[in-house]
Regions:
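A solvent-exposed interaction/effector surface
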Residues: 1-151
């Protein structure tokens, strides 16, 4: 059984690149490549060693099984958002955090277990229409079985 940790997270401002996707395998590496190349253009980055990926599930997800996937970094302000980039505010809240250790191809299985097993039996409900992935110094490579990321 999955057992998340719970954290109180303050509000965050994030800036990054977004793609509208149905989850095809090439979409994620492609948008990460674009984001990494443009990362140096983002001003006011709070911690350049921490990246996020935010997945926004709107009505499109229910109707078309598509969502917006956004690799991003936290910034101190939205004063200067580079062209073709997107800015989003992440609200302060108590979040359930799930750790993934292993290669990135195992991440979809963790999502499936969170939404199909843990959430229905947890007594919790989704507060927002997004989830967030954290990639910090513990994440080394996509194919490293020791890599760590959090959802």
């Amino acid at each position: 059984m999955l057992s998340p940790t719970f954290i109180e997270l303050g509000a965050k401002k994030v800036v990054g690149c977004a793609i509208y996707t149905s989850g095809t395998q090439t979409d994620f590496p492609n948008i990460w490549d674009v984001f990494i190349k443009r990362l140096k253009d983002i001003p006011n980055v709070l911690n350049p060693t921490v990246n996020y990926a935010v997945e926004f599930y709107g009505q499109e997800f229910m109707n078309e099984s598509k969502w917006f996937y956004m690799p991003c970094v936290e910034v101190s302000s939205f004063d200067e958002i580079p062209m073709i980039m997107v800015a989003k505010s992440i609200p302060a809240a108590r979040y359930a955090v799930f750790k993934h250790v292993g290669i990135v191809s195992g991440i979809p299985d963790l999502y499936s277990r969170i939404y199909k097993e843990w959430l229905p039996s947890s007594g919790f409900e989704l507060a927002f229409d997004f989830d967030m992935e954290l990639y910090d110094e513990r994440f080394t490579e996509m194919d490293d079985p020791e890599s760590i990321m959090e959802i």
